[in-house]
Amino acid sequence: MSSEDYGYDYDLLFKIVLIGDSGVGKSNLLSRFTKNEFNMDSKSTIGVEFATRTLEIDGKRIKAQIWDTAGQERYRAITSAYYRGAVGALIVYDISKSSSYENCNHWLSELRENADDNVAVGLIGNKSDLAHLRAVPTEESKTFAQENQLLFTETSALNSENVDKAFEELINTIYQKVSKHQMDLGDSSANGNANGASAPNGPTISLTPTPNENKKANGNNCC
Ligand SMILES: Nc1nc2c(ncn2[C@@H]2O[C@H](COP(=O)(O)OP(=O)(O)OP(=O)(O)O)[C@@H](O)[C@H]2O)c(=O)[nH]1
């Protein structure tokens, strides 16, 4: 039976989390990728939000469910629930703010402590349109990414530069990990939960499919 027979509109669901300091542009990267929207006056995220976009790889419909939360410490009482079931993460900093880059070490440690060992991770230097205010050299971030086995892209949520590329590279990497895991298991888990990815007609790990595409999950409704 195919997943369509079960009434699902995707074959695999990947939970991806966005992390990074407040104001680096996480919410705008999410809205640019999922809705092609940008908001110059966006307010700090309160609670947790998510939005989805479905892509096709190898003829399979991959639904990326991307979670966004506030970078501010005072809103961050949800850490372990936020990371639970994530198969990918993007650590975002602002290329014009060196403190946001220096804090990437903290975000990487928090991710490693809370997420699955197999989680695929990308580093994003956002606001590349602010080249005249650049405070973080590209080469420095590239080296940091290589040393920590992270994908690396500089993006602009404002003018869309590399936003699709950054998300698609991460989703592709997750997909390769899932495919490899299935091959290692002789494909016996074709509907299964390689690295925590959930398939509609396989066992659901920590994420259940949602009926609505874009949801807000504030406070008690969250996680
Ligand atoms: N120039 C420029 N500004 C951006 C870009 N992305 C986001 N911004 C602006 O940066 C500010 C913060 O953006 P948000 O997307 O709310 O940042 P955030 O990381 O979600 O912030 P928190 O929710 O507080 O964690 C807003 O004024 C955005 O308009 C970008 O690529 N270029």
UniProtKB/Swiss-Prot annotation:
Compartments where located: Golgi apparatus membrane
Principal subcellular localisation of the protein: Golgi
Further remarks about this protein from its record: Present with 5955 molecules/cell in log phase SD medium.
MF-aspect GO terms: GTP binding; GTPase activity
One Pfam entry name: Ras
Keyword vocabulary terms for this entry: Acetylation, Autophagy, Golgi apparatus, GTP-binding, Lipoprotein, Membrane, Nucleotide-binding, Prenylation, Protein transport, Transport
Biological classification of the source: Eukaryota, Fungi, Dikarya, Ascomycota, Saccharomycotina
Residue positions bearing lipid (S-geranylgeranyl cysteine): 222-223
Record's function text: Required for protein transport in the secretory pathway. Probably involved in regulation of secretory vesicle formation at the trans-Golgi compartment. Plays a role in autophagy.
SMART domains: RAB (SM00175), RAN (SM00176), RAS (SM00173), RHO (SM00174)
Positions of short motif Effector region: 42-50
CC terms in the record's Gene Ontology section: cytosol; endosome; Golgi apparatus; Golgi membrane; mitochondrial outer membrane; mitochondrion; recycling endosome; trans-Golgi network
A GO BP annotation: protein transport
Residues bearing PTM N-acetylserine: 2
Protein name as it appears in the record: GTP-binding protein YPT31/YPT8
UniProt similarity note: Belongs to the small GTPase superfamily. Rab family.
Disordered: annotated span: 185-223
Ways its activity is controlled: Alternates between an inactive form bound to GDP and an active form bound to GTP. Activated by the guanine nucleotide-exchange factor (GEF) TRAPP complex, and inactivated by GTPase-activating protein (GAP) GYP3.
Residues annotated to bind GTP: 20-27, 68-72, 126-129
Biased composition (Polar residues): 204-223
Biased composition (Low complexity): 188-203
Protein source organism: Saccharomyces cerevisiae (strain ATCC 204508 / S288c)
